[in-house]
Amino acid sequence: MRKTALSGMPKSPLNISGGSPHWRHFDGLQPYAPLVQSMQEHAAAIRAEGAAEAVWLLQHEAVYTGGTSARDADLLAPGDIPALRNGRGGQWTFHGPGQRIAYVMLDIAARGHDVRALVHGLESWVIASLADCGVAGHRRDGLPGIWVQTGNSPSGMDKIAAIGIRISRWVSWHGLAINLDPELAAFDAIVPCGVRDGGVTSLAALGVQISMPQLDQRLQARFHDFF
């Protein structure tokens, strides 16, 4: 797959500072509930105390999470993996080893109160970062996340990244998940994001050999193109 050139891409209207945010990398697999509690507390501190905007990069222990639109019927057979509802936007997804989570805590009030622009910026950030890995990512009208053309599902498109955010007092939290090399069979236990005509893929399944630190470098390098 050829790398897509993105030079000259216009800045997002959300871009307000070359120095923000603070980046934090978590080592090891993180339990879901305590990490989300810490994220919620930091998001609240951004609004109440002027804490720094932040992007947290991590991997979770295996867990299914359901957003505000998640239906019980789409949780098919979770087995021994915990299934938790979390209040973000979206439906069911899987988090686990081999998946890069980016939790994005930004002051949306300082960025025009534009939630739609935030989501578009997150999508564009993922697409640009994937392009730097030699993968062409796409949006699908009316459907969340970033998709790649594989021909392996009824739609011909498989999801490689999920996006789900929550806004509290005009501060974003939650964020996105990029499949580097997770256990893709884990997605068979749910209807991922409620979409039945698309599969799930990963960078590894597409033949891309890249480490998690190398993916992180691409994410950090592209962030200020859009925020």
Predicted segments — roles?
Residues 1-155, 160, 189, 209:
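N-terminal lobe of the biotin/lipoate ligase/transferase fold
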Residues 2-3, 147, 166, 177-227:
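C-terminal accessory segment of soluble enzyme catalytic cores
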Residues 102-104, 163-165, 178:
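Preference for bulky hydrophobic residues occupying beta-strand positions
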Residues 161, 174:
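A translation/RNA-centric and nucleic-acid-associated enzymatic feature enriched
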Residues 169-173:
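Glycine-rich phosphate/pyrophosphate-binding beta-alpha loops
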